[in-house]
C-alpha cells in the first residue's frame, strides 16, 4: 500500500466536503488509467480510493444510522452530498468496464471532455454540444446520469400538484421530500399527510443512498409495509 499521511488525507477530505472531485486535476484518461492501476494493485492506493472503499463497506451502517432517524436539514444535505460525491470511488465502475472505456478513449472513439449542461443543437448527423467557446459534434449520446432528486425541478403534474398544495415539501433545497421513517409524507405545515407515502430517490435527504438495491428490499421498505399494515389494522390514515 501507499505511505500513511494524515495531513494529506485531512486535506483531501476537506476538499471533498467543499467540492467533491476538486482534488483531481489530471486529464480524464490519465486519472482513469491510474484508478485501474490502483484497483489491480499495480499502484499505491490514493486517499480517494481508500476512502471510497471504506464508504462502500460502511453503506449498511450508514443506512441504519441515517434512515430511521430524522436529521437536521443542513446535516442531511452535508451527509448526502458527501456520500454522493464518494460514489465515484465506492460504487464503480467495475474495473473491466473502466478498461474498456480506456481502450475506446485511446482509439479515439470516446472523447472524455466534460460539459456542464451545454446547449444542444440537432444536426443532420447527430448533435452539436456548445458550452461557452467549446463546441463538439457527436453522433451518439448515452444518458448515463440520473437527475438530482430536486423537488424544485419536477414537472410531473401529480407531484407538482402535491408540492404546490403543500402536501409534499423538500427537506432542504435541492433534496427530496420530507418523510417519516415509515415513508409517510410530511407537509409544509409539519403534519403527516394521511394516505400519502413516498420511498426511493425523491425522498433523498430523508433517506440516503436510495438508488441501491438495499432500499428496494431493505429496512426502509419494511418500515413502510409495517406502517401500512398497522394503519389498516387500526383503521387510521
Region roles according to the model:
Residues 1-232:
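Flavin (primarily FAD) cofactor-binding/catalytic cores of flavoenzymes
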Residues 234-237:
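Short, flexible loop/turn segments with low-complexity composition
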Amino acid at each position: 500500500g501507499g505511505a500513511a499521511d494524515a495531513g494529506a488525507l485531512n486535506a483531501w477530505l476537506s476538499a471533498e466536503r467543499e467540492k467533491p472531485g476538486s482534488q483531481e486535476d489530471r486529464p480524464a484518461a490519465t486519472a482513469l488509467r491510474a484508478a485501474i492501476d490502483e484497483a489491480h494493485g499495480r499502484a499505491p492506493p490514493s486517499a480517494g480510493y481508500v476512502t471510497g472503499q471504506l464508504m462502500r463497506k460502511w453503506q449498511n451502517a450508514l443506512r441504519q444510522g441515517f434512515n430511521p432517524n430524522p436529521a437536521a436539514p443542513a446535516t442531511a444535505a452535508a451527509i448526502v452530498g458527501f456520500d454522493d460525491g464518494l460514489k465515484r470511488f465506492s460504487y464503480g465502475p467495475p474495473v473491466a468496464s473502466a478498461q474498456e472505456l480506456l481502450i475506446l478513449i485511446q482509439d479515439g472513439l470516446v472523447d472524455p471532455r466534460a460539459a456542464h449542461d451545454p446547449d444542444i443543437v440537432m444536426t443532420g448527423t447527430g448533435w452539436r454540444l456548445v458550452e461557452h467557446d467549446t463546441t463538439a459534434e457527436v453522433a451518439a449520446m448515452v444518458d448515463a446520469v440520473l437527475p438530482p432528486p430536486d423537488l424544485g425541478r419536477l414537472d410531473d403534474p401529480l407531484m407538482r400538484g402535491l408540492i404546490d398544495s403543500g402536501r409534499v415539501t423538500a427537506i432542504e433545497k435541492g433534496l427530496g421530500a420530507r418523510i417519516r421513517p415509515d415513508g409517510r409524507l410530511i407537509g409544509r405545515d409539519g403534519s403527516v399527510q394521511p394516505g400519502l407515502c413516498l420511498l426511493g430517490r425523491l425522498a433523498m435527504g430523508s433517506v440516503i443512498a436510495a438508488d441501491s438495491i438495499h432500499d428496494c428490499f431493505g429496512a426502509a421498505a419494511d418500515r413502510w409495509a409495517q406502517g401500512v399494515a398497522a394503519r389498516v389494522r387500526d383503521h387510521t390514515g
